[in-house]
Every structure is written in C-alpha cells, then in structure tokens.
C-alpha cells in the first residue's frame, strides 16, 4: 500500500517556492498509503537527482530547485527494510546517456524467479520493485518497447511511474490505481495513486489551477507525457497480470480467493492485521474486513472503500 505522486509544470507557471508547497502538501496527503519512507526525483543542472529518506512525508524538508517535473513516492514497507535507504523509492538507473528513476506501487512475487530466468545480476537492494529497473536496464533503452517488456514479465500487482533526464514521464498501468489530472489552462499535470488523495491535496493547495480533465488509464496502458505536455500511449499484454489472483498487496505470493484464508503466509497475516487496524479508525470491524475478503474483494478494493467512504 504505497502511493505514487507528482507534477509536471510544462508551461513553467509556478516558481520553486510554489512547487515545493505543492509537493509538500501532495506528499503528506499520500501518507494515507504509506509513512515508512518518502522520496522524490527531478532533473536539475543536467542531472537526474533522487532524494529519499526513511521518513514520513510530513517529516521531510523539501528544497526542490525550479524544475518542471517532480516524481514522488510514499512507502509502506512489504519487502526490504526501509532503514536501508537503497530499498526506498524512487530507484535511479543509467543506460548509456539516459538517466531514469522508477517508482512502484504494489507487490511483485516473481522477482526472485525473474532474476534467475532473465539472468539479471544480484543486488543489495532487497525490494521486489527493483526487478522492474533491472528488466528495463537489460533492454539497454528506455521507451515504450522496454517498458512493455518489463511490464509483461511482472506477476503481481503494480502501477509504475518512470521519469528520464529529458523530463519525459511514463505511467505503466497495471491493476493498481492511478489518478492523473490535467489542468490545461495553466499547463500542469498533477497525479496521485487515488482520486480521493488527489482531491484532498488539491483542496489544501493554496493555488487555483482551473478545471481539470481526468486522464483515463486502463490496465495494460503505458502513457508518456513529454516535457511539453504532449501525451502518447502504448499498450502491453496483461495476460500474466490477469492470470494471477487479484490480492493486490500480499507480499511474495498471490493465491486463489477460495484458499486465501487457509494458506496465509506470515507476511499476508501481518498485512491483513495492519489493514484491519487501519479500518478500525473508519469504524469497520475485523469481521467486516474478513467478510469482504471472503466475497472476493482485494485489499486494494478495501483500501479504496476506506478512503472513499463507500461500504
């Protein structure tokens, strides 16, 4: 249960101070989906910079220069201790003259298998998410083709954002949520993992952007937004994604709905325990959460119910 967030100010309407304010408010709103670590990526002085710490967003002190694109992530740890900062998002990589950063929301369970079958190098990074970086790196380029190659090999739940050192921003949409607003009047894209989080952040931001257009993405879509705000789409095959059962956030394994309660791993048990604890703040009992799981709802579905107040 992590959160992706960010903004692209392609008309450069806002100054550095205003962008720091926007990102600070947006990242704090994203704490609803993770407080173990926070990170951002941006381009400055011809170099892609990543700033991340094992801190909740409200404890971060951003000092972002006057840049156009900022990509962020708040983390709830499932695999890889957040105290080791290399496990936190975004992840940095270089392919020739291309620098890129990647952030992932979801849980992948075939990272160990992929590292063997794809003959990828071992790494000190412990998170399942990092396999996505390595799959792109193996293709020796960053484009629709390499992103599709990566996405079609991942088994689990995901939505992924990637930015490069030319201020191109990519969204790779799996089965996890993503909400993107385009404020064409002022020339800005703002996004977060859920519409509820994005709306709450926008309500708190002391600047008016005009009326947004929501950019619709389906599972299997890859969206590219370039530095000028131009959008381009591609697709990837979701057969592997849909072949696994839809328990979005259970670490390491996805298992069928009919057997889930009988075969929970310790990691799954801990995640459900945390979900129930969080649900109690909204007035939902443990029995209600169990009932929803028995009926086939995913943990992601239940999270959306909590944040959107529908049940």
Per-segment meaning from a language model:
Residues 1-311:
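Conserved short alpha-helical segments that host acidic/polar catalytic motifs at enzyme active sites
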């Amino acid at each position: 249960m992590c959160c992706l967030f960010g903004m692209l100010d392609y008309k450069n309407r806002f100054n550095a101070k205003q962008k720091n304010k926007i990102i600070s408010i947006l990242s704090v709103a994203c704490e609803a989906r993770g407080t173990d670590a926070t990170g951002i990526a941006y381009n400055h002085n011809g170099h892609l910079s990543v700033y991340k710490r094992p801190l909740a967003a409200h404890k971060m002190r951003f000092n972002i220069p006057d840049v156009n694109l900022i990509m962020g992530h708040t983390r709830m740890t499932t695999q890889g201790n957040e105290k080791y900062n290399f496990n936190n998002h975004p992840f940095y990589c270089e392919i020739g003259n291309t620098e890129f950063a990647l952030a992932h929301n979801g849980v992948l369970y075939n990272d160990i298998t992929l590292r063997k079958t794809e003959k990828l190098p071992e790494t000190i990074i412990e998170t399942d998410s990092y396999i996505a970086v390595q799959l792109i790196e193996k293709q020796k380029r960053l484009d629709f083709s390499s992103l599709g190659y990566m996405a079609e090999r991942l088994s689990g739940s995901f939505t992924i954002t990637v930015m490069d050192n030319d201020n191109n921003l990519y969204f790779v949409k799996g089965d996890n949520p993503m909400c993107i607003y385009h404020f064409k009047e002022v020339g800005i894209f703002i996004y977060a993992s859920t519409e509820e989080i994005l709306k709450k952040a926008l309500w708190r931001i002391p600047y008016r952007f005009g009326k947004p257009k929501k950019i619709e993405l389906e599972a299997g879509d890859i969206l590219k937004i370039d530095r000028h705000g131009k959008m381009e789409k591609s697709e990837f095959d979701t057969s592997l994604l849909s072949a696994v059962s839809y328990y979005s956030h259970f670490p390491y394994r996805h298992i069928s709905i009919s057997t889930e309660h009988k075969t929970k791993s310790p990691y799954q048990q801990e995640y459900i325990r945390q979900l129930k604890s969080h649900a109690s703040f909204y007035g939902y009992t443990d029995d209600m959460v169990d009932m929803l799981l028995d009926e086939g709802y995913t943990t992601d579905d239940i999270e959306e119910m909590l944040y959107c107040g529908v049940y």
